[in-house]
Amino acid sequence: PVCHKNKPIKIKNTFNPDGAGTVIKQDVSNPQSKAIKGISSINDTSLITVQGLGMVGVIGVNYRIFKALAKNGISVFLVSQASSENSTSIGVRNADADLACEVLNEEFVKEIEMGEISPIQAEKDLATVAIVGENMKHTPGIAGKLFGTLGRNGINVIACAQGGSESYISFVVENKSLRKSLNVVHDSFFLSEYQVLNLFICGVCTVGGSLIEQIHSQ
């Protein structure tokens, strides 16, 4: 009701009643605020890709995909499609992956038999990470900074998606890379430009001793 009537909600801390609190409202855009407001993740992701040259230029392929999944109660939280139209990737929970593959293989059984679409399988044990921020659409270079950070840290991005509202970017990585992804993305967007690093040096030989003297003289 408050959303439809455009009424702001103010949340106060009972242990700190004099604090400013948090205001939730519809219009929160502020050109001066940070582009990224938060990072979220889903650690039980399976990626299912429907692909084949028989999809190119064919109307209704995605409709059939989502209709078949919805009919079987399978929720999709990520969609990524190439501009060439020869593949569509969807993210589902690991628990839904086998059923999703089964219903999609049944839906496209004729196309698979004719070789127009490849047999549909799931890539399991992945994780989805999303960065969210209202000011992303006003800030150039967010995607470049994000994927540059991941690349420099040796994290492979399996799939990615961005909404037309430009308020979020989602990407899929291996589950083992989830914690590292969250850490490096957080450091890149939320820490200051200058960071304090801890350097550990072992050894007392000539090279090690000279290095320690140089550091001490700085």
PLM ranges: what are they?
Residues P1-Q195:
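C-terminal catalytic "cap/lid" subdomain
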Residues V2, G141, L211-S217:
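Ubiquitous "structural anchor" signal
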